[in-house]
Amino acid sequence: MSYLGVGVSPGNVPVYHGTNLKVVDRRVRLAELVLRCVICGLGILAAVLVGTDTQVKVIFTIQKKAKFTDMKALVFLVIANGIAAAYSLIQGLRCVVSMVRGSVLFSKPLAWAIFSGDQVIAYLTLAAVAAAAQSSVFGEFGQPELQWMKICNMYGKFCNQVGEGIVSAVGVSLSMVILSGISAFSLFRLYGGNKGTSGGRW
């Protein structure tokens, strides 16, 4: 019997046959390409929204300017999303080339490299979102015990734009988590029986 083009042996061990493997690989590669395009777009959007965010407030004739570099968590968020966007662009181009060539991923070292890279970027973006979200909570509600002011009461526009950037960054993180699952599937299926011989290497 088969499911999604994957043959199943009597011992319930998945066996990927040559033609079926190419069909599955094409579907996986298409889903991967879509996700990488989403990550690239949202990553750039998040970095631009946060990185260009400034607001000037005049307090008793003194100008106070809020910018993303005032909070290290936001700097981390911009850098992490910039890295994620660049990485996804490179990997997206790899997907396009392999789809045009009609090749199937048989190289275990390459599969391990993609899997490891996706894991690193996923953890990086999740950490950046968590740090930025925590800093944003402090900016919105303050910390009375430490006498930290509610910064967003003074810099409303700045905080709103940061919030939009964080929402975009959350989309990047969730997409990277899903993409990590896809790259894990692409890697570990190479250890699941006969990989077949048809199709080019990539």
Swiss-Prot record:
<dbReference type="Pfam" id="PF04535">
    <property type="entry name" value="CASP_dom"/>
</dbReference>
<feature type="transmembrane region" description="Helical">
    <location>
        <begin position="30"/>
        <end position="50"/>
    </location>
</feature>
<comment type="similarity">
    <text>Belongs to the Casparian strip membrane proteins (CASP) family.</text>
</comment>
<keyword id="KW-0812">Transmembrane</keyword>
<feature type="topological domain" description="Extracellular">
    <location>
        <begin position="131"/>
        <end position="164"/>
    </location>
</feature>
<feature type="transmembrane region" description="Helical">
    <location>
        <begin position="73"/>
        <end position="93"/>
    </location>
</feature>
<feature type="transmembrane region" description="Helical">
    <location>
        <begin position="110"/>
        <end position="130"/>
    </location>
</feature>
<dbReference type="InterPro" id="IPR006702">
    <property type="entry name" value="CASP_dom"/>
</dbReference>
<comment type="subunit">
    <text>Homodimer and heterodimers.</text>
</comment>
<feature type="topological domain" description="Cytoplasmic">
    <location>
        <begin position="186"/>
        <end position="202"/>
    </location>
</feature>
<feature type="topological domain" description="Cytoplasmic">
    <location>
        <begin position="94"/>
        <end position="109"/>
    </location>
</feature>
<feature type="topological domain" description="Cytoplasmic">
    <location>
        <begin position="1"/>
        <end position="29"/>
    </location>
</feature>
<dbReference type="GO" id="GO:0005886">
    <property type="term" value="C:plasma membrane"/>
</dbReference>
<feature type="topological domain" description="Extracellular">
    <location>
        <begin position="51"/>
        <end position="72"/>
    </location>
</feature>
<keyword id="KW-0472">Membrane</keyword>
<keyword id="KW-1133">Transmembrane helix</keyword>
<protein>
    <recommendedName>
        <fullName>CASP-like protein 2B1</fullName>
    </recommendedName>
</protein>
<dbReference type="InterPro" id="IPR006459">
    <property type="entry name" value="CASP/CASPL"/>
</dbReference>
<feature type="transmembrane region" description="Helical">
    <location>
        <begin position="165"/>
        <end position="185"/>
    </location>
</feature>
<keyword id="KW-1003">Cell membrane</keyword>
